[in-house]
From Swiss-Prot:
The keyword NAD does not apply. This is Phosphomethylpyrimidine synthase. Zn(2+) binds at H437, H501. Homodimer. It comes from Salmonella arizonae (strain ATCC BAA-731 / CDC346-86 / RSK2980). Gene3D superfamilies: 6.10.250.620, Radical SAM ThiC family, central domain (3.20.20.540). It is an enzyme of class 4 (lyase). Catalyzes the synthesis of the hydroxymethylpyrimidine phosphate (HMP-P) moiety of thiamine from aminoimidazole ribotide (AIR) in a radical S-adenosyl-L-methionine (SAM)-dependent reaction. One of its GO terms (cellular component) is cytosol. Its cofactor is [4Fe-4S] cluster.
Amino acid sequence: MSTTTLTRREQRAKAQHFIDTLEGTAFPNSKRIYVTGSQHDIRVPMREIQLSPTLISGTKDHPQYEENEAIPVYDTSGPYGDPNIAINIQQGLAKLRQPWIEARADVETLSNRSSAYTRERLTDEGLNALRFTGLLTPKRAKAGHCVTQLHYARNGIVTPEMAFIAIRENMGRERIRSEVLRHQHPGENFGARLPENITPEFVRDEVAAGRAIIPANINHPESEPMIIGRNFLVKVNANIGNSAVTSSIEEEVEKLVWATRWGADTVMDLSTGRYIHETREWILRNSPVPIGTVPIYQALEKVNGIAEDLTWEAFRDTLLEQAEQGVDYFTIHAGVLLRYVPMTAKRLTGIVSRGGSIMAKWCLSHHKENFLFEHFREICEICAAYDVSLSLGDGLRPGSIQDANDDAQFAELHTLGELTKIAWEYDVQVMIEGPGHVPMQMIRRNMTEELEHCHEAPFYTLGPLTTDIAPGYDHFTSGIGAAMIGWFGCAMLCYVTPKEHLGLPNKEDVKQGLITYKIAAHAADLAKGHPGAQIRDNAMSKARFEFRWEDQFNLALDPFTARAWHDETLPHESGKVAHFCSMCGPKFCSMKISQEVRDYAAAQTIEVGMANMSESFRAKGGEIYLKREEA
């Protein structure tokens, strides 16, 4: 952990330098490849990890090698992972999806912004220095049309987005020929449907059934299509955002780029401080992944932070503002009903969701039903016009182990299931948010309740944290629960950083949270038996057994840390070819011994070899461990 503390001015200057000097960068010994589709001129970006050959025979002067296949992996970094693409944050990313959106001929360009707040911001000359210069002219559905991926799927249309996703989810595994790499243990998928090959039609079918969503606002054409669903790879979300206390636009853009580099499948902008509108514009125009928000946070800012002063009109204006900027999914706490609030009175930690507490306070102060619930159909109409997915928020999630799986939590969950059916009437895509703080033995019930009462809509959970005793390490406590619930069927995991419960995460915290959650998601994919999930593990194990250190570093989720820790004790280049590491040394390396036994057995008959080894073992006193000079 770094002990260097920068001033606010230094932090902003450092972030600005990062943005100004940003270039497309590949991971060590990796290259960007594009897998093409058979339709729509689709090119799906992936990262291909190049591996060194294996020494199989020969002499020191004339060694014989066998090539190792390159390993393709899922890549969320967008243009930032391609050294051949010029990056300019001031201009934003290329509009990948714009031709697809326009070809459907069901959208119209707006002559003016629908949000009064947006119009006010655009005419404020005092904001010129902060404003993104290449603003898009927003689009919305033509009258009588619906532009959601769910609408297309239900009408039997395979969109370019669906075709893109099918290629992406297969992760290039069709390229792998080695039986060693293709070997995979059977999984336990708890009823999930995991086809051997993901086709565009399968993607369409899952979206049409509501079991998966494609967050893809028509006003965020820069995003690369991805899917969230139980029958696909487990995804990870990263939260960023400023607060009234700290952070700036440049720091949040830096965190966005950093998050996509380290594997964020989506990013939520949870900004609550100044310049929320301007910060979000910079993030959207430079994001290759879907962006989510919690609109009630900004609506609260518009009424000076006084929850009682919130109105449907202010909230509706915020939805229009964000939808026309390009937000891909909204977290809406419409399930926090007035009658559920008293259920939380006996909790140890009450209501811990910011959105949930805001709506609970509004309900109690007015003694009226939650206006998000009352106006839910109007919310759906707005979402359908821009293809904004709904993430139905768990405002009553447990904030402590003691409060897990209580009546308030599940009452809200059942209401979210009812709201899901309403959203589907409007062809609006839906996922369900989940806890929270749940001990391990109580986690699976959360998944089974969600599948039953929310009609198999994708589940999206914050962890859950499996213990409350580790502030500073809650990425660990929650990573355990995340791996478990991902295995049980959760579609997306919201990361937790080391700063959870302690402060706003910085760039390094974002990385630590993401690495932890990529481990959890991958472990869940392995346990489910997702086709091809074990290829990278097999490649790593083979490299480890063959002492190909460079390949071990490069196959790691974090190559830089793997290399740095190896080099702490074996920094010289000779350490990169040594047949041991500093853990055991040359005499006690189990893999080196295994190789020697294997070579010995290959040179002689098994019976003779075992007899000789047995005789040698007895001659040396029958001891498992020997002093170095005896060995």
